[in-house]
Amino acid sequence: MLTPYKHEPFTDFSVEENRSAFEAALKNVEGELGKDYPLVINGERVTTDDKIVSVNPAMKEQVIGVVSKASREIVDDAFKSAETAFHTWKNVNPEERANILIRAAAIIRRRKHEFSAWLVKEAGKPWKEADADTAEAIDFLEYYARQMITLKDGKPVNSREGEHNRYFYTPIGVCVTISPWNFALAIMAGTTVAPIVTGNTVLLKPASTTPVVAAKFVEVLEEAGLPKGVVNFVPGSGTDIGDYLIDHPKTSLITFTGSRDVGVRLYERAAVVHPGQQHLKRVIVEMGGKDTVVVDKDADLDLAAQSIVTSAFGFSGQKCSAGSRAVIHQDVYDVVLEKAVALTKQLSVGEPTAPDVYMGPVVDQGAFSKIMSYIEVGKEEGRLMVGGEGDDSKGFFIQPTIFADVDPHARIMQEEIFGPVVAFSKARDFDHALEIANNTEYGLTGAVITTNRHHIEKAKRDFHVGNLYFNRNCTGAIVGYHPFGGFKMSGTDSKAGGPDYLALHMQAKTVSEMY
């Protein structure tokens, strides 16, 4: 009997024992760098000549690992493996499938600092961000296991006299999981185990910047007892195999987390029925945001400034939930701006292996160049208050940056930057603040800092985002507590870590029997 779900606690690094344990994990991971990682097809290791070289974004000359790349021919083999495994796996008792997730969670929990250390090295995450990523991965495993047990017998429906009716869920088929680099363990794990616990099989294509963490996770699933062929590990570039995975007639379900442009293109391609395809593909996408922290005139102004800074600069702003817009009532605008600038000047930027560094690097050269180009745009569109500098000589470091007095329709108020940049805009009143908050094509997260109950209720109704927070930052959703997913161009509102999520990976069946 499983205990009720409760989220994995974060590590308190002010405790010397925890700091020492994490430092030891970092040292151990240092000794593991540079190894080769094969593909996994039907439980077999497959090595290719074409490789992905994963590097440390804080120290770009340091190789984290070398991962084999899948070709289209190998992808075909992976589909055959997944299709064959599906015919057996779909009939496995849901509780047995759930137990594999529970065992995988226990393995990661025992090796929590190790996985977090890999995230520090491969994704450039500071200690606390890496620890939260690992904790979230554990949460997805524990939560989805329990959700599957809840759903295993279906839902009650009515029966008439002489008739017995059942309504239950069945798996869909082969799922293609395309996971992001910014939550290289948590989102990758969640979007892999949701399909498998519901009885589907998976082709996992992780982000090319963080494939080593994904390879380590596949090893955990094998150790937990996952049968061969249920998950097939097929890292590769989107150019080489991305479209091929989406277009393949054996693909039944696609789960994607990434940019708006790629997500929209994927959604369009998935609608096409290819020769040999006998089904419509189901698509789950999460595509980012342009998220706003709204500050009312009667807000706690210290809380407001801290919420803006935390939302904007955690993990260098590389979260789809990051608060890249601060919309502030004109009566308190200057005070909140001054407080936020002062807090930002206190933030440390550096090598994330150091325990007290707040911000590490951005993920790669492409991200660095894009963010720096937006900073140049920001200098034309607003008043640079702090930051604005970058250094890619050793790693990809950018200072936390605030622009003030930005027009609500300016590019840096409308376009997702995915970096440590926040734009401040002034609102006439609360209604105007909500109008600005809603004026983007995205609708993922938002926060409102206010003590006005009427305004809280108005924002609940009129602030059009999937995840809305009051009197706190707009990042840091917890599985089972804050089901996560957005409106508009932020995706399909497929609430990850919520009670409806697993049903998206299944199809409902009605059976009516007369007696």
Curated annotation (Swiss-Prot):
Parts forming coiled coils: none
GO biological process, one term: glutamate biosynthetic process
Reaction(s) this enzyme catalyzes, per UniProt: L-glutamate 5-semialdehyde + NAD(+) + H2O = L-glutamate + NADH + 2 H(+)
Cellular compartments per GO CC: cytoplasmic side of plasma membrane
Organism domain of life: Bacteria
Residues at the active site: E286, C320
Pathway: Amino-acid degradation; L-proline degradation into L-glutamate; L-glutamate from L-proline: step 2/2
A Pfam cross-reference name: Aldedh
EC number(s) reported in the record: 1.2.1.88
UniProt entry keywords in alphabetical sequence: NAD, Oxidoreductase
GO terms assigned for molecular function: 1-pyrroline-5-carboxylate dehydrogenase activity
Classification via PROSITE patterns: ALDEHYDE_DEHYDR_CYS, ALDEHYDE_DEHYDR_GLU
SUPFAM superfamilies: ALDH-like
Top-rank EC class of the record's enzyme: oxidoreductase
Family the entry assigns: Belongs to the aldehyde dehydrogenase family. RocA subfamily.
Name under which the protein is recorded: 1-pyrroline-5-carboxylate dehydrogenase 2
Gene: rocA2
